[in-house]
Amino acid sequence: MPNHQSGSPTGSSDLLLDGKKQRAHLALRRKRRREMRKINRKVRRMNLAPIKEKTAWQHLQALIFEAEEVLKTSQTPQTSLTLFLALLSVLGPPPVSGESYWAYLPKPPILHPVGWGNTDPIRVLTNQTIYLGGSPDFHGFRNMSGNVHFEEKSDTLPICFSFSFSTPTGCFQVDKQVFLSDTPTVDNNKPGGKGDKRRMWELWLTTLGNSGANTKLVPIKKKLPPKYPHCQIAFKKDAFWEGDESAPPRWLPCAFPDQGVSFSPKGALGLLWDFSLPSPSVDQSDQIKSKKDLFGNYTPPVNKEVHRWYEAGWVEPTWFWENSPKDPNDRDFTALVPHTELFRLVAASRYLILKRPGFQEHEMIPTSACVTYPYVILLGLPQLIDIEKRGSTFHISCSSCRLTNCLDSSAYDYAAIIVKRPPYVLLPVDIGDEPWFDDSAIQTFRYATDLIRAKRFVAAIILGISALIAIITSFAVATTALVKEMQTATFVNNLHRNVTLALSEQRIIDLKLEARLNALEEVVLDLGQDVANLKTRMSTRCHANYDFICVTPLPYNASESWERTKAHLLGIWNDNEISYNIQELTNLIGDMSKQHIDTVDLSGLAQSFANGVKALNPLDWTQYFIFIGVGALLLVIVLMIFPIVFQCLAKSLDQVQSDLNVLLLKKKKGGNAAPAAEMVELPRVSYT
């Protein structure tokens, strides 16, 4: 007890109490100390949850400020939609702490560069089908984004064209080329209505041009797919002429397999072949000049060689990509990837220049060309575009670029990269501590069956507590990379749902179908991708708790570097060294889904459930209660008899000890050691 200020003990000191009261007081103090120690131990073991602060207006302002900073950093114009998406990126996902699985995410809100090795056709619509051919762009649906910063990766060299004098590394330079074709004059007095003269059509078109060392005009023979016939066999002279002198020549989808010309991208490997030149090594100007009277005194362009004159029509510049150059003399080459409509997109970057037959002046024709969904054009200044090959991967970055779906003559000073929205990505997600299941009803039934197994009730409780401790311990030592790099399945599911609802898929469906056949085709293609996604979803076993993504039964190896997954999300799909081979991964998911088909025997499961419920019947527990009662009774009897037996045994041992002591004294003194009144004759004991 604390002392008084004067140093004398206080009136409540233990020294002033008598013995009995002092003992009671000390016992009370010891009891209080024990209670305090118990309370302290409980407090130390208690994990108090922090008090959640209510969301205040200051918090919302801070979030909006961070979202605005994200838009400023990415140079994205601030709109309600972009601000909403920026808020989604600012709000941090919950940390990962459980089992990870691969999730199938259809139509993700990301863009990947399209490589020259892409085998999917890129459709291009134009507003000048008379002079460019192809499909018409009736709907005029054009979009242009604000400035964005683009940074992705690609397995192959991305499709890139430079319309400026400056060409980024990995891009192709374009230039104006002359396309010539002649049609017959009209003479009704002649058989077939054809006159003796010819009318020459001159068209200046922007396409792959002569760029010095990057162009080889030496004819090379190549074996093309049967889809591209030889022009001289498939299209004869005047085959499409209908007697109209004002009708321009048609575009012919054919090739000259023995007249291939190769173009090389700046500072990169690979060749782009063009088989649309009838005479790549010989200037046809002299031949035209020698027949000047036949063509109505037509004079070919000055200081410009002519290599694209064909009498049946203008030959479409179908480009074929060769990823790894082989022997140029090898005719049996099958690795050519065709790109049939990209020339129309390049042609729209500048005005078409047309000289009609009999006219001295050239006509300037404005043209626009648009790519269809899911393709988009990334437009930027050449000096702000960087394409670098690191190992087997191409790293593409573009600062202050814009996304658009159409090109016209305003793009003359820019470079363009084709990008697309991938049909799906595979993303590792965490589903927490819950097991993977694809049927909620059966899983709930299993939970109930496990809970009612009477014989495992106590063991389940003990194992459950042990598992909980193990899980908490494993969470405490979880890797930092997994927590920082992987998102939870709930977060990804909600994000994809929000983005899907915010970025509505009604881009084209509202258009009038009766006058927009190409828009309808885009819708059909888009719906086809949706059907493909649904087919994949139906053929894959998915977690039942997530509706907007498909969490597959394939576990994700958390020990793998996150850079491999990041490379896939940035556009690498077929490189096992730095990313995942998505095709192999998809096949593995399909095989596991087939093996994971739920073969639950519902009748057997129901019988098991009924047996478990029957085991909980109190009448069936009577025998267990009887056995427990008999055991308890026997235990009580043993506990009651044990003290008596122990006491008797102790007395017997004391008597034996006394007798031994008396015997030893007699033997030592040779007489009676006990008083006469108490003498007792003991039997003789011999000791050996």
UniProtKB/Swiss-Prot annotation:
Entry-linked InterPro entries: GP41-like, Retroviral_env_glycoprotein
Impact when changing F138 to A/S: Complete loss of viral infectivity
Chain positions covered by the region annotation Fusion peptide: 457-477
Transmembrane segments: 625-645
Residues in the Extracellular compartment per record: 99-624
Protein name: Envelope glycoprotein gp70
Signal peptide: 1-98
Region (Immunosuppression): 463-481
GO biological-process terms attached to the record: fusion of virus membrane with host plasma membrane; symbiont entry into host cell; virion attachment to host cell
Site (Involved in binding to the cell receptor): F138
Annotated propeptide span(s): 455-456
Residues bearing glycans: N127, N143, N498, N557
Quaternary organization: The mature envelope protein (Env) consists of a trimer of SU-TM heterodimers attached by non-covalent interactions or by a labile interchain disulfide bond.
